[in-house]
């Protein structure tokens, strides 16, 4: 192989290796910013047929309804604890900060944070639905057939 061909081959290999490295580093950086959406029952029992549960420490978003009577505020700080439920289960959410003005018991909510235990989320952000006629598509699909009421087992404080 002649010298110019070797030089050209090395240059092409260097460009390909650089492109592969760039793509790999970009995908690695983006993976830490992905927040998967779960309903309370998917956190407890896993998603669909795969029964894949989120791992402890995983960043995620949970959507559902705020259980009436579950909101507890700390008198010494901005910490708020509440329960988010859907048709098959409920999870506890802890949030330290100012809640949105439209946050209410019995309303739809999406909490973004880290799964602390099997049924507890430490939220970094809480979003409340902003219009009485609007429900985010993820929550609407998860709550279908439930008519906005907590199932009896959930309202009695049982984990389904």
From Swiss-Prot:
Similarity comment: Belongs to the CcmE/CycJ family.
Record key words, sorted: Cell inner membrane, Cell membrane, Cytochrome c-type biogenesis, Heme, Iron, Membrane, Metal-binding, Signal-anchor, Transmembrane, Transmembrane helix
Biological processes annotated in GO: cytochrome complex assembly
Periplasmic topological intervals: 30-160
Protein localization: Cell inner membrane
Protein name, as recorded: Cytochrome c-type biogenesis protein CcmE
GO function terms (MF aspect): heme binding; metal ion binding
Task of the protein: Heme chaperone required for the biogenesis of c-type cytochromes. Transiently binds heme delivered by CcmC and transfers the heme to apo-cytochromes in a process facilitated by CcmF and CcmH.
Any one Gene Ontology cellular component term annotated for this protein: plasma membrane
Topology feature Cytoplasmic, residues: 1-8
Ribosomal protein is among the record's keywords: no
Binding site for heme: 130, 134
Membrane-spanning segments: 9-29
PANTHER family documented for this protein: CYTOCHROME C-TYPE BIOGENESIS PROTEIN CCME HOMOLOG, MITOCHONDRIAL
Membrane topology, as annotated: Single-pass type II membrane protein
Stored InterPro entries: CcmE (IPR004329), CcmE-like_sf (IPR036127), NA-bd_OB-fold (IPR012340)
Pfam families: CcmE
């Amino acid at each position: 192989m002649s010298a110019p061909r070797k030089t050209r081959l090395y240059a092409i290999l260097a460009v390909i290796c650089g492109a592969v490295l760039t793509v790999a580093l970009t995908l690695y950086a983006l993976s830490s910013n992905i927040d998967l959406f779960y309903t309370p029952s998917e956190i407890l029992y896993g998603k669909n047929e795969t029964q894949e549960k989120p791992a402890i420490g995983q960043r995620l978003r949970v959507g559902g309804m705020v259980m009436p009577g579950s909101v507890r505020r700390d008198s010494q700080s901005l910490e708020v604890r509440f329960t988010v439920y859907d048709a098959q289960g409920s999870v506890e959410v802890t949030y330290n900060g100012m809640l949105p003005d439209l946050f209410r018991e019995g309303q739809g909510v999406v909490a973004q944070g880290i799964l602390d235990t099997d049924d507890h989320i430490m939220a970094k952000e809480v979003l409340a639905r902003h219009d009485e006629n609007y429900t985010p598509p993820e929550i609407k699909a998860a709550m279908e057939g439930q008519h906005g009421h907590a199932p009896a087992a959930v309202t009695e404080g049982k984990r389904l």
